[in-house]
Each structure stands twice: as C-alpha cells, then as structure tokens.
Amino acid sequence: MATYLIGDVHGCYDELIALLQQVEFTPDTDTLWLTGDLVARGPGSLDVLRYVKSLGNSVRLVLGNHDLHLLAVFAGISRNKPKDRLTPLLEAPDADELLNWLRRQPLLLVDEEKKLIMAHAGITPQWDLQTAKECARDVEAVLSSDSYPFFLDAMYGDMPNNWSPELSGLARLRFITNAFTRMRYCFPNGQLDMYSKASPENAPAPLKPWFAIPGPVSEAYSIAFGHWASLEGKGTPEGIYALDTGCCWGGELTCLRWEDKQYFVQPSNRQMDMGEGEAVNA
C-alpha cells in the first residue's frame, strides 16, 4: 500500500506508463498523486486523461495551469495552439466526458495523517492552511458549476498579486488561481511576482522562490508541487518536494514514493529543451 507522487506529465503517456511499471504501481492497493498539468506539449494528452480517469479512487490530482487552459480552449475562450498538441483530445468522441471530469478536480490536496499537501505551483506564504483550503474551494465550486466558462474567461491576468481577505469576485478568484497554478517567485512580504522565470540563482533581488519564504503551511506540512521544471527537482528546503523535472522538454518524469522517500525517474522520449512556457498568460 504505497503512495506515489508524480510530477507534471504534460501528455507524456508512454513515459507515465513506463514509470508506473517501473515502480510496480498496483491500483488495487496503491495510490497515485499527480501534480497537475496532465496535458499539453507531449503527444499523448488524450491517452493520459483516459488512463488517469480510469484509475478512479486510486488517483488523486490537482489542476495545473495547462489543465485550466485546456478547459478554456474547449469552452471556446482561448485559442488551440499547435505546440500544445491538444487537437486529438479536443476532437475525441469522449472529450466532453473527459473535460467535465477534469474540471471537477481540486486545486489542493491535504492528507492530515501524512502531513502532506500537494498543489501544482505550491502554497503562497501569505496563507495559513485554513485560508488555502477555503480559497481552493472557492475556485473549485466555480469550476464545477455551469458558470465555469465565465470564470475561465476572467482568470487570465497577473493582477491582483497581493493577497487580502478583502479581495472579492473575479479578482479574488484570479489571485487564487495564480497562487495555486502559476506562482514561482514572491517578494519578501509574500506578494507574487508573475514575471520572472529565471533559475533561483539568477533571480533579480529581492525576489525569492515561494518556498524560501517561511509561511505557516510549510512550517507544519510537507508540500509537493510541480510547475517549475527548471528547478530540476533541486534546491528546495527539507519537506518541500519539487517533482516537475521537465519530461515534456526532454528531461525526466519523476516519482517519489512517499513511505520511504525513494525517487524513481523515467527518461523522456524527447530531446532536451528546458525552455518553459506558461499556458495562462503565455
């Protein structure tokens, strides 16, 4: 009965299956956690969604920015970019079923027994756990409702970039979405910087990676996240697990077995190209 945490799949279906075979994943007894961005860039987004959905209660996942962008494309709000390689998924006979399932997935996973949290980009140091849970539920409720296209149309944007309990309406939902799915750097006060994608050693002052700023959640829980492939899984404090190692860019697909903290990797079938792109506000 193992728990396997896997980083951003990005349509790399063959590598996902090979990695699960490597760790001898057994859906009847094991649990799979996925950091989001199941789709885009790799060639197998349709197969990834079909497979992950078929796992039922054996899988837990969080939504990433590319997953949200896919939903916006399907809703006719955003443009389908050839580089995302989403056309087979969008034209599939079961696309409606798959994407209605996808939009009902959470932004945040919390396991109190394991003291483990997963979010695609991480947890802003401005939030305590109760706030993070409430904020996740706010966006999840809208995504699960019939008005979800209205939200998807309004989610694009970098502002507001500073949390306040007084935020309301679409501004509040946009901040929450950015914090959970796009965040990399923060100012020392926790305010989000939505522009820098440099590696931490090259980040302009006074920016710091979100995980380098102490916050109430990171002090009490382990946090697993994806999104930031250029970290290559390195440079995070104890208890912070960066799992996106750029499989779709030619890197690796990484798995962490939670019980003994052992890592497993599956090399990408693609050539190395660690340039990163944003789906939201590309």
UniProtKB/Swiss-Prot annotation:
InterPro entries: ApaH, Calcineurin-like_PHP_ApaH, Metallo-depent_PP-like. Signal peptide: none annotated. Its EC number is 3.6.1.41. GO terms for molecular function: bis(5'-nucleosyl)-tetraphosphatase (symmetrical) activity. It catalyses: P(1),P(4)-bis(5'-adenosyl) tetraphosphate + H2O = 2 ADP + 2 H(+). Keywords: Hydrolase. It is an enzyme of class 3 (hydrolase). The keyword Hydrolase applies. SUPFAM superfamilies: Metallo-dependent phosphatases. Pfam families: Metallophos. Gene3D superfamilies: 3.60.21.10. Hydrolyzes diadenosine 5',5'''-P1,P4-tetraphosphate to yield ADP. Belongs to the Ap4A hydrolase family. PANTHER family: CYTOCHROME C5 (PTHR40942:SF4), PTHR40942. This is Bis(5'-nucleosyl)-tetraphosphatase, symmetrical. It comes from Salmonella paratyphi C (strain RKS4594).
